[in-house]
């Protein structure tokens, strides 16, 4: 349960996820550039209806690509939970709570390991006292 080991594992994990997230973000930006939201003109209701339908399709594609990025980072935090479980010998549910507590603090990922260490040690102490 060395903070340096945990921090290096999380940084390696984050580097791989950052690379994938960058690719997904480039894909999203390329799609936004290729398919911008179309302006409504208001002259002809049929044309506006057609434009509104096209915009709905474009927005759904934006959302689909954005959701891919969100799912990627959710998987990152699941993997961080696995690291916390393994390194601190915590039950999975407790490790999930530790990671969620750190995420709720809305800190940058650069400070993630130190906060995880703090909360994981606290959780470990509580579990030792209870059991």
Predicted features along the sequence, with ranges:
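Short, charge/polar-rich alpha-helical segments
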Residues: 1-25
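Soluble, cytosolic/nucleoplasmic coiled-coil alpha-helices used as oligomeric scaffolds and tethers
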Residues: 30, 34-37, 78, 82
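Coiled-coil termination/hinge junctions
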Residues: 76-83, 87-91
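Charged, low-complexity interaction regions
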Residues: 33-45, 88, 107-112
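Intrinsic disorder/low-complexity segments
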Residues: 11, 15, 56, 62-63, ...
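Amphipathic alpha-helical coiled-coil segments
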Residues: 20, 54-80
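A long, low-hydrophobicity, low-complexity, charged/polar interaction segment common
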Residues: 88-131
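Extended, amphipathic alpha-helical coiled-coil scaffold segments used for oligomerization/tethering
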Residues: 39-52, 56-59, 91
